[in-house]
Amino acid sequence: DEMSKVFAEWNKGELDSFLIEITANILKFKDSDGSPLLEKIRDAAGQKGTGKWTAISGLDYGTPTTLIAESVFARCLSSLKDERVKASSVLVGPEGATFDGDKKEFIENIRKALYASKIVSYAQGFMLLREAAAKFGWNLNYGGIALMWRGGCIIRSVFLGKIKEAFDKNPQLTNLLLDDFFKQAV
């Protein structure tokens, strides 16, 4: 319940997005016996291929899509459930530790890191779009693309409007991280 409340709170601010919203909901959802459903869900993710295609395109066009590629690798590792279980019985991990620092500060640092990583991920995605547009001679409306993702898309996020503003201000923007808003945010 505590983690759900943290994600729900984050979803009221700059992290407001579909993925944060559903994470808050999943974390608080109880099974019919009253226990957290999350503990009963198999921790093995599949994939549809869009992340893989994006990571491969990043390599093809020489564009760093490191966060997108890492999410694909995390899913690959996740899908190796049987191997992970077997390895956990053979490899010794660290002993359980209790946190003795400032919990509020720790949670705030996680929020900031998540926000920065989301910004960098979008920046990398738009760099890839810009590189593909240059290669194929496309004239893309990057602000319009950002707004397109606001409705009903898994990557919808409140700061897609900020991305549109950045490209409206500077249609030739080569990297979101060079925009004043995003530069300040990270």
What are these regions (language model features)?
Residues 1-186:
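C-terminal substrate-binding/catalytic lobe of Rossmann-fold NAD(P)-dependent dehydrogenases
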